């Protein structure tokens, strides 16, 4: 009886999270705050970790983002585009530090951290072949993304061709598409917040609609590469 009750509670919470995922990632119109969304997801993960019978192929812990929209062509990421975890208290931070210590097999060592502000937008992947932008993809569900090359080409921060002499034959650049708050001020009547403005604008069917929004792009890492020489 207890198992059946737990499964029922889990299913209700999971269905609710799937609804919010669709609103957040596909409709760009969230119904709840980020903190409430994160708490609901943490509750589900805690249930999965406590009661192993809840885990399945559709486990919450394996889900990133939302399924891609049907209006875009799909493509599988060569390396999954994962999502950052978060915490809202010192307990979560201590857990993070302990995981690092265990991974490094070290104890009683003080860690030094460097940090940077997180830009809240929508993740994008840019593949360059022979220095030219060949394909642009959204994160999608982390495993499969949406091909949005023409939309990404409308962003001035994204070069269509790399001028550098020493550049790999093929490389995937990953980064964040976002909109500055002062730019968002002029279009705030159309979107709930800057993050939704970036996501909604980037996933327009017509690239010319994307061009009308002052989107920015910042790169933070690379995925796969062919011919990249790194000495350190």
Predicted ranges, named:
Residues 1-232:
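RNA/tRNA-interacting regions in translation and RNA-turnover enzymes
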